[in-house]
Amino acid sequence: MFCVQCEQTIRTPAGNGCSYAQGMCGKTAETSDLQDLLIAALQGLSAWAVKAREYGIINHDVDSFAPRAFFSTLTNVNFDSPRIVGYAREAIALREALKAQCLAVDANARVDNPMADLQLVSDDLGELQRQAAEFTPNKDKAAIGENILGLRLLCLYGLKGAAAYMEHAHVLGQYDNDIYAQYHKIMAWLGTWPADMNALLECSMEIGQMNFKVMSILDAGETGKYGHPTPTQVNVKATAGKCILISGHDLKDLYNLLEQTEGTGVNVYTHGEMLPAHGYPELRKFKHLVGNYGSGWQNQQVEFARFPGPIVMTSNCIIDPTVGAYDDRIWTRSIVGWPGVRHLDGEDFSAVIAQAQQMAGFPYSEIPHLITVGFGRQTLLGAADTLIDLVSREKLRHIFLLGGCDGARGERHYFTDFATSVPDDCLILTLACGKYRFNKLEFGDIEGLPRLVDAGQCNDAYSAIILAVTLAEKLGCGVNDLPLSLVLSWFEQKAIVILLTLLSLGVKNIVTGPTAPGFLTPDLLAVLNEKFGLRSITTVEEDMKQLLNA
């Protein structure tokens, strides 16, 4: 086992990465190794998808499957080894079908890629794990060095984050052939184990640029189906009655669950990255969408144990449900998996609803505590002139984009302290689950404009980018000249690709934490600092002083 893709990876003087029987996320060595095997199979599939496009062959089954299967290897998504192997077998079957299509056009069709003809050696998981050793990401570290390995992983993990957003968009009916062609090209190239530093750096920027387009079609999918989010108050306390909790990012799953629970007497609560769903008109119209439950994903083993109903996980993040003994009432959807947990293959939630009706639910309603969400792209753009007016009248000094992933590391209290230290004449724009560090606190307003503005999920960084570009255009300056600072927390691969997106768009002087990614060497961090001004957090006092005086 070698995995260094998330923030909680093991860090030692000898090197970074989980490499024992089990990773810090709870992923076993077996599952981790089989995910490496799956990635190799997907690289071979992409190699043939690139070749097929040369013949004008576009296979939509391949295009929809490839990013979805890659998504299953993202942190805290799928811990079920047999399902990972199932994805690998499906990748190979699709590859062979695509290969046959190519050969039907050109009998001499060939692909020069080491993954192009990969076959699984056995049905036995142990044998497959041994085969996977051939594809462990650091297998040639001694030959290429830590810097090349780190850049490869930056590209691989960034592309994995983009693949997750591609799947979210695909679920909502969004498809862009250019994006899929670019995805396959990059995925296939990474399967050749590239070792050129400049080429890898260029690839990382290409991934960021591609992901901006992915976030654009995801935004179109969400707003097209569920309307543009508008500011909405959400109760974060319990309401009496039977209940279901839904977590993850998939708004379509939430919509289907709301439709199917309507009139059943079962209330629905959002968790984690589902919180922004309350801002969408077509979702909040369901009166039994009663509130948001819990805090950051890392607290779920305590909070889910206390929730008196079933829980549905639609995407990341799931962690071991046996710890809180709620594994008999947590359900996985789509690419999510945990051994022994019931999985919903389709969009029928009747079994979950039946379980909710058999459980006690909340015995009484607590005193409501309301927070505000729903500052989507349209709302943010509508406030652009107000922001400019406040700045011109010196009522608004600075905007801090304070967002990203949450996690268990104690140093993450920095983000709470930073938010509460922001001066009263400054605004906080937040997104993703890092907001749970401070989103239940009171921040007041500036002439009626809330000082805490929740823009949505991690992918809604797109809205923040569009706002920044709009403000810059109206003020006749560059984005980096705005009174705007980005202070981002990271945990997994979606955050990595958001960072690459920002860097590829030329955004500079981003501050990140609580730690640097374990796969980025001091040399690589120095390169990113020199090219983009990217740096790690220090203390709240020092960072606040530097950012306000920038």
Swiss-Prot record:
One of its GO terms (cellular component) is cytoplasm. One of its GO terms (molecular function) is 2 iron, 2 sulfur cluster binding. It comes from the Bacteria. Hybrid [4Fe-2O-2S] cluster binds at H249, E273, C317, C405, C433, C458, E492, K494. Keywords: 2Fe-2S, Cytoplasm, Iron, Iron-sulfur, Metal-binding, Oxidoreductase. One of its GO terms (biological process) is response to hydrogen peroxide. The modification Cysteine persulfide is found at C405. Pfam families: Prismane. Binds 1 [2Fe-2S] cluster. Binds 1 hybrid [4Fe-2O-2S] cluster. Its EC number is 1.7.99.1. It is found in: Cytoplasm. Its main location: cytoplasm. [2Fe-2S] cluster binds at C3, C6, C18, C25. It is an enzyme of class 1 (oxidoreductase). InterPro entries: HCP/CODH (IPR004137), Hydroxylam_reduct (IPR010048), Prismane-like_a/b-sand (IPR016099), Prismane-like_sf (IPR011254), Prismane_a-bundle (IPR016100). Catalyzes the reduction of hydroxylamine to form NH(3) and H(2)O. Belongs to the HCP family. This is Hydroxylamine reductase. It comes from Shigella flexneri serotype 5b (strain 8401). The gene is hcp.
